[in-house]
Amino acid sequence: MKRTFQPSVLKRNRSHGFRARMATKNGRQVLARRRAKGRTRLSVSK
């Protein structure tokens, strides 16, 4: 049986990367929440 997680850096960054987050209002809210919480890594790409 094929596993569900087939890693790809490109797909990962396109959907969850910093620029993808900045592209939408909700994505910016995600980053703001993570900054407020004090996360070292705001997104997977950064």
UniProtKB/Swiss-Prot annotation:
<dbReference type="GO" id="GO:1990904">
    <property type="term" value="C:ribonucleoprotein complex"/>
</dbReference>
<dbReference type="InterPro" id="IPR000271">
    <property type="entry name" value="Ribosomal_bL34"/>
</dbReference>
<dbReference type="GO" id="GO:0005840">
    <property type="term" value="C:ribosome"/>
</dbReference>
<dbReference type="GO" id="GO:0006412">
    <property type="term" value="P:translation"/>
</dbReference>
<dbReference type="GO" id="GO:0003735">
    <property type="term" value="F:structural constituent of ribosome"/>
</dbReference>
<protein>
    <recommendedName>
        <fullName>Large ribosomal subunit protein bL34</fullName>
    </recommendedName>
</protein>
<keyword id="KW-0689">Ribosomal protein</keyword>
<comment type="similarity">
    <text>Belongs to the bacterial ribosomal protein bL34 family.</text>
</comment>
<keyword id="KW-0687">Ribonucleoprotein</keyword>
<dbReference type="InterPro" id="IPR020939">
    <property type="entry name" value="Ribosomal_bL34_CS"/>
</dbReference>
<dbReference type="Pfam" id="PF00468">
    <property type="entry name" value="Ribosomal_L34"/>
</dbReference>
